[in-house]
Amino acid sequence: MSSVLKAFERFTIEQELQDRGEEGSIPPETLKSAVKVFVINTPNPTTRYQMLNFCLRIICSQNARASHRVGALITLFSLPSAGMQNHIRLADRSPEAQIERCEIDGFEPGTYRLIPNARANLTANEIAAYALLADDLPPTINNGTPYVHADVEGQPCDEIEQFLDRCYSVLIQAWVMVCKCMTAYDQPAGSADRRFAKYQQQGRLEARYMLQPEAQRLIQTAIRKSLVVRQYLTFELQLARRQGLLSNRYYAMVGDIGKYIENSGLTAFFLTLKYALGTKWSPLSLAAFTGELTKLRSLMMLYRDIGEQARYLALLEAPQIMDFAPGGYPLIFSYAMGVGTVLDVQMRNYTYARPFLNGYYFQIGVETARRQQGTVDNRVADDLGLTPEQRTEVTQLVDRLARGRGAGIPGGPVNPFVPPVQQQQPAAVYEDIPALEESDDDGDEDGGAGFQNGVQVPAVRQGGQTDFRAQPLQDPIQAQLFMPLYPQVSNIPNNQNHQINRIGGLENQDLLRYNENGDSQQDARGEHGNTFPNNPNQNAQLQVGDWDE
């Protein structure tokens, strides 16, 4: 039997790896579009600034073809280069288009009519057509210019420093548009505005050279539609990653923005690794996770096997990105989302409510994270040289702060389906510990017992962790049955409910809330507003309210 299981594990891993061809293999050739890219061989800042504005106008033009916009984008991203001829060769690697370089000497005064070099392959009709496209801005562009300030285009630019400041200000906006061009292009632009504010604060973006939102949207749309441009940008990102600490301004900027672009489209995979495997909590030993753990192992090997370009699978439209979809490991994904919802407030802004999300295992993750927040990792504690008393003190401190007992305020439970703004809890103060703005613990989930007098025997948990929280001497009521957040899984046998109540902590500890003296005076509160009196002979009453009360 063991040989069959080993063969299954090897089969699962090889199934992910054997589909990939050799690196550098040339795909079957398809029809290619001709893309004209403009090259300026002189460092003249005036000519380059005119080319910058010309490219912006071509991208925003309402009658420009896709090939016109692709050529304008590649030219735009190549303008800071001292040797544009060599830099544009990065785009030659793309099997999607045929790049034609057109050397330009300048523009006719007062117009955007190109003055081609003798070696440029441009006809008079093409030059006239480009001039018409540059003047054909859509009515959604205000003041006849892509910039917010109407006088920016007409300003003189006779210094290299002036050109670089203006060019970097425009390019950094284009790079920010790359961040969401493949994953959330139709979402509100709140994240883009925050990044613009960040780069303005750093001095990389001058507010005077901000583009209109419509111009930014058109740039993002053009990048999204062109695989050639995205392949070119991927090479730029790889160049930026290889730079040392002594780099130029442009690649330092690209490397910074690249952190927002890397691993886009793989968020579910990395969050699953972080909150499911990274925590190393006992529910990972469930038999239901065995097959999916093998799947995650094969995906980690696939990611390493792809190499440097694995960070840009979404940007490159690589088919391998489908292998990392959470639909291939739904149970452990659901468990990880439950853990992350409790541990990380920002997780509540992540859309994890997929059709395959299992409410049963999501609740396992929620309950486990609530109970495990006060445990101590023995290996880390040994490295720090903590004594048993110090470990107990840390655990008690976390418990008190998570419950909000320091100020006599009971901590409110976390409902992952309510926006974080509606879950604000009063600040909890415990002696000289800084106040917490929000409590991520339920207040009733990890025992609820006041710390009794006398020596407490620590409870040893799975995963090499020890729980130093005091255990109640007696619990007068039975454990609450597991009530899932999803109604479709509510008909669970009682024996399974009894088992779920034991995951992440000891049994019969999650209904009482004790006061500061350790007396069980408050009624226990369960899911959906049910209260359980401390007096077993008293009938339970229905409490109207929600999690936030």
UniProtKB/Swiss-Prot annotation:
Polar residues bias (residue ranges): 531-542
Annotated stretches, region: Disordered: 517-549
Pfam families tied to this protein: Paramyxo_ncap
Alphabetic keyword roster: Capsid protein, Helical capsid protein, Host cytoplasm, Phosphoprotein, Ribonucleoprotein, RNA-binding, Viral nucleoprotein, Virion
Subcellular location: Virion; Host cytoplasm
GO annotations of cellular component type: helical viral capsid; host cell cytoplasm; ribonucleoprotein complex; viral nucleocapsid
GO molecular function: RNA binding; structural molecule activity
Entry-annotated residues carrying Phosphoserine: S439
Family per record: Belongs to the paramyxoviruses nucleocapsid family.
Function: Forms the helical nucleocapsid (NC) with 12.71 N subunits per helical turn and a rise of 5.3 Angstrom per N subunit, protecting the genome from nucleases. The encapsidated genomic RNA serves as template for transcription and replication; encapsidation by N is coupled to RNA synthesis. Forms the encapsidation complex with the phosphoprotein protein P. Before encapsidation, the newly synthesized free N protein, so-called N0, is chaperoned by P.
Domain characteristics, as noted in the entry: Ncore is globular and carries the regions required for self-assembly and RNA-binding. Ntail is an intrinsically disordered monomeric domain in the C-terminus.
Description of how the protein assembles with itself and partners: Homomultimer; forms the nucleocapsid. Binds to the viral genomic RNA. N0 interacts with the phosphoprotein (via N-terminus); this interaction allows P to chaperon N0 to avoid N polymerization before encapsidation. Interacts (via N-terminus) as N-RNA template with the phosphoprotein (via C-terminus); this interaction positions the polymerase on the template.
Protein name stated in the entry: Nucleoprotein
Organismal lineage: Viruses, Riboviria, Orthornavirae, Negarnaviricota, Haploviricotina
Gene name of the encoded protein: N
